Amino acid sequence: MANVVENLGKLERRVTISLPKDTVQKEIDARIQKLAKNVRMPGFRPGKVPLKMVAQQYSGQVEAEVLSDKIGQEFFTISRAENLRVAGQPSFEPKQEQAEDAYAFDATFEVYPEVKIGDLATAEVERSTTSIGDAEIDRTLDILRKQRVHYHARGEAGEHGDGGADTAAKDGDRVTVDFVGKIDDVAFQGGTAEDFPFVLGEGRMLPEFETAALGLKVGEQRTFDLKFPDDYHGKDVAGKTAQFTVTMKKIEWPHLPEIDAEFAKSLGIEDGDLTKMRAEIKENLEREAKRRTQSIVKNQVMDALLKISELDVPKALIEQDQQRLVEMARQDLAQRGVPNAKDAPIPAEMFAEQAERRVKLGLVLAELVKANGLEAKPEQIRAEVDEFAKSYEDPKEVVRWYYSNQQRLAEMEAFVVESNVVDFVLGKAKVTDKEVSFEALASASSQA
């Protein structure tokens, strides 16, 4: 008899599964007989427990297992016979009306949607481009110099000078202070510290605190009011005004290393050649710019594809992805050292919108890849692995590391497929190139 698949909505379907009771009972009997060979009961040797006693104790459990297995097998058979593309897991419920000779269940499930991708020629993509010149190299060198900063006591003569005649604390100085904070003349937790170091101008402290420390000399103190922001992380003091007294203990001025051969050697240029150093920095910046522009344009392409595509999204797939995102969030918390992160109460609902986008995009990409032969080729995967390995000291070891793990290789394959999709769409869409600075590019990619 043909199976009747009921249409319950856009993607929801239902089919009735019928299992002959005699077939189910035969399987139950067979499993109980097998179980009896090993079951243990007080007063009986192993394997010598009467079959009737085994059946009395285990028949309910065995029946549930057999029904679960049979239902799953029958649903699989029906889905293949009816060419059903089932999305997610079906739910099974006993029918209210049961025949005498068969078990009857309703299987409710969702199917994959039809994906309609519009005309790619109507898609609009803004492609960021950037060029690396001397200004970008100089800015990078400034950052590298600041990462290697040394501090020296202000006013004390040393190898690099004394920091100038003015010994008051200035922007960029590392200062060490004692401070006492009170709210309504009562000290509060975290409001008092001794020998507390921070760099003026880095923004680690609240603006009022930094302003109060600026201009002080060693031994001087200043009392000032500080209003904590309403959204301050310390809830006990958020929105309140405290009175602080800060005492300057030490002032150290920053000394940045000169850009010379020694500096170049510290960056890995063995012979200290400054021209080689700048060339290597430029190469690294160009590689980073390429990576960031690829990331930004990929997001632009994905957004464009979603705008021109029509499809219904299976709820089951969204729920599965929500749970996947919850687990990813817990893993992230665990890596940050948060206690009991694996049991953190993270509501799946907070990922509903993100999960729907991910699932929808996955369905669109799968359709586009299948329709246009955009699967990753082995040589493409190897080329990307080689490119990635270039930035490491031992590229061959990185390549071996990739190819020794199927999961890592699968991630690279997914990256190549996405790149194929991006290139394919860019070849057909309305693309506008926009020149941006490296700093703007970095900011845009961090927000993407």
UniProtKB/Swiss-Prot annotation:
Domain PPIase FKBP-type: 172-257
Catalyses which reaction(s): [protein]-peptidylproline (omega=180) = [protein]-peptidylproline (omega=0)
GO cellular component: cytoplasm
Signal peptide stretch: none
Any single biological process term in GO: 'de novo' cotranslational protein folding
Pfam families, per the entry: FKBP_C, Trigger_C, Trigger_N
EC nos: 5.2.1.8
Localization: Cytoplasm
Domain notes: Consists of 3 domains; the N-terminus binds the ribosome, the middle domain has PPIase activity, while the C-terminus has intrinsic chaperone activity on its own.
Job description of the protein: Involved in protein export. Acts as a chaperone by maintaining the newly synthesized protein in an open conformation. Functions as a peptidyl-prolyl cis-trans isomerase.
Listed name of the protein: Trigger factor
